[in-house]
Structures are given as structure tokens and as C-alpha cells.
Amino acid sequence: MAVMMRTQAPAATRASSRVAVAARPAARRAVVVRAEAEAAPAAAKKAAEKPAWTVPTLNPDTPSPIFGGSTGGLLRKAQTEEFYVITWEAKKEQIFEMPTGGAAIMRQGPNLLKFGKKEQCLALTTQLRNKFKLTPCFYRVFPDGKVQYLHPADGVYPEKVNAGRVGANQNMRRIGQNVNPIKVKFSGRMMSPAEI
């Protein structure tokens, strides 16, 4: 009897579920609205009208952020070697951390800051981009006064995609297609990177 009850109970629920499915209304139709094909050429025209990127020029009269500390003597080498200058445009006055230690207040509008090392400019660039959503760029200034624009090299930061950018030190092959290292090491001759 107990076995019979177990088999009969699920049958009753199955029948009730069939009735519930049959009582549902039919599915509704979905209407798909598509934009006209004219929108794509308009976007292509906007991309074609974009002006070519040009290297920004350094304005030495740009004010520096308000900073009470010093660079630790790192700019003394600028008399014989080069130093680095970072510039950015701030929306408002804000306090930021200096890569050399301490804090400074960036001015509203253009800012210019000198450093002795390129790494300090990169560190400040990371902070300004991540925390303040600014777009800094930096330059190398030689002792004779010549200025070289450094970063971002083609106007787009390295982690972004830029059409036409050529990869540096790029091998277009899988790791399994590399030459066996033993053949290179014990060959008795130097191999060029093209052969490897």
C-alpha cells in the first residue's frame, strides 16, 4: 500500500502541472525596430573629419603647483644632463601626492612640474589619470634648451587601442613555433633575431 501511494502521488502532480501549462495564454510576438542604414555613413564622416594629431608644445611660463618641499637636489644634474617636465590641465585646485615625497596643491588650469627622473613623471601620470581623471603629458628638456616630447608618444596612452600603432618588439608567432633553445645555444654561432 505504501508503495502504491508513492507512485500515485507524483502522477497527480504531473496531471495538475499539465493543466497549468495548457491554461497559459499563447506567447506574445516581439517587434524588432531597426535603425535606417543612413546612420553608419554619418559615423564614418565624423571619423574622417577628425583632425590629425600633432605634438603639443611646451609653454615654460606655465605655473607650478603650490609645493613647500624640494626635489631633493635631483635637478642639479639638469645643468649637465637632462630633466623632465610634466604638464596637465586641472579643473579645480586639488591636493595630490608628489612622487618625491610630500603633497602639493595643483592649480586650477595649466600646471607644470619639473623632475629629475622619467620614472617620477610616470608615477605622477598614473596618479593623475587614475585619481583625478586628467590627461598629463611629459617632455625631456636638454641642457641646451631643446625640448623633446615623450609621453603619450602618439597622443593615445599605451593601454588604449590606436589605429595604425606599430607594435614594438613584437613576434607574430605562437610560443610553440619558437626555435629549440638547444639549437641556438650549442650551434657555435650567433643567430640574428630574424632567424630565431
Swiss-Prot record:
Q: Where is the transit peptide?
A: 1-35
State any GO CC term: photosystem I reaction center
Keyword presence, Zinc-finger: no
Q: Subcellular location, in the record's words?
A: Plastid, Chloroplast thylakoid membrane
Where does it primarily localize?
plastid
Q: What does this protein do?
A: PsaD can form complexes with ferredoxin and ferredoxin-oxidoreductase in photosystem I (PS I) reaction center. PSAD may encode the ferredoxin-docking protein.
Protein name stated in the entry: Photosystem I reaction center subunit II, chloroplastic
